[in-house]
Each structure stands twice: as C-alpha cells, then as structure tokens.
Design a protein with these regions (language model features):
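Cysteine-rich micro-motifs
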Residues: 115-123
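N-terminal pre-ligand scaffold of iron-sulfur
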Residues: 26-113, 129, 143-160
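Short, highly charge-biased, low-complexity peptide segments
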Residues: 137-142
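Short metal-binding segments enriched for Cys and/or His
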Residues: 126-136
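Bacterial Sec-dependent N-terminal signal peptides
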Residues: 1-45
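Short Cys/His-rich metal-coordination motifs, predominantly Zn2+-binding knuckles/fingers
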Residues: 89, 122-125
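Generic detector of short alpha-helix boundary/capping microenvironments
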Residues: 13-14, 74-75, 121
C-alpha cells in the first residue's frame, strides 16, 4: 500500500543548493583592506564645506590610508565615505587623493576639495566619488572601499 521512496532528492539538487547558499552569502563590496576600526565624528559646524554637493574632505589620519567624505545631497543627508587606499595597488601603497582648493584654510590633517574625482598617487587611476567610488580611468577595476555613514543633528559619523 505504501511505496518506499529511496532517493527523493535528485543527486544534482544538493550541489545546486550548496552553490545557491555560497553565492547568496557573498558581499558586493570589495573588502581588500586589512581591518582597521573606524569611528569618525564630523561636526558640520566645523566642516561646513561638507554641506555643499560634490564637495569632499580627506581626513588623512583616519581609516587605513585616510578617509574621503563626499557630500552628495545635504538636504537628504546623502554622503559617501571611502578609504583612500587604492584598490589596484597590492601592497596598499597607493593613496587616492583629492584636488585641494587653493587658499581655503582647513583643519590640520585634512584636505578640502570641490572636485568629485579621486586620483591614485601611484597608478593614476581615477575614481568618481559621487557615484560610489567607481573607477573611471586607469588600471583599477574595483570600487573604493566604502564605510558606513550616519548623519543628522548637524553631524556625520563614519564607521565600519
């Protein structure tokens, strides 16, 4: 009356399920850098340059090789934060810099810019900072490593 089912799952199904779990657990971000704890508090009253769209500030002594914070849209609290380490250089020696604004006083250890491009000082790769750190020219083919941003109450906090 009852039929015994010896192999209810085809042999191909188990490897497919394992592959599905392996692929679905991968991250979209390029985490190529060694872990460095990041917790950067930025008061916008001090860094009011970050209240203007496309403006950026490089904090040279934060993160692995510095942290670049970019204002995308201050009305909606939209900001990006990236590590300044170039993803192309395998020895982590390339630093993505921003073009400084001449004659603009800045805080110690910071560079202010109104340009939305970051350029590696070693390989020359260029990155679009307002489109998520996308490489647009040069040998780099990975995005800059992003950090988490929370903003509000007149400040920005960058964490990992």
């Amino acid at each position: 009356m009852f039929k015994i089912i010896r192999n209810p799952v085809p042999k191909i199904a188990i490897p497919l399920i394992i592959l599905l779990f392996a692929v679905s657990c991968s991250k979209d971000q390029n985490n190529f850098l060694p872990y460095v704890r990041v917790n950067l508090y930025i008061p916008l009253a001090t860094y009011n340059h970050l209240t203007i769209p496309t403006n950026s500030v490089l904090f040279q002594h934060e993160g692995y090789r510095g942290i670049i914070v970019v204002c995308v849209d201050p009305a909606s609290n939209a900001y990006y934060a990236f590590d300044a380490c170039c993803p192309y250089e395998k020895d982590y020696s390339g630093i993505v810099t921003i073009q400084p604004i001449a004659n603009l006083p800045s805080q110690p250890g910071t560079i202010y810019s109104s340009d939305f491009l970051g350029i590696c000082n070693k390989c020359g790769s260029k990155f679009n900072l307002i489109s998520g750190g996308q490489p647009i020219e040069g040998p780099a083919n990975h995005f800059l490593q992003r950090y988490n941003i929370s903003s509000g109450m007149g400040s920005i906090t960058v964490t990992n």
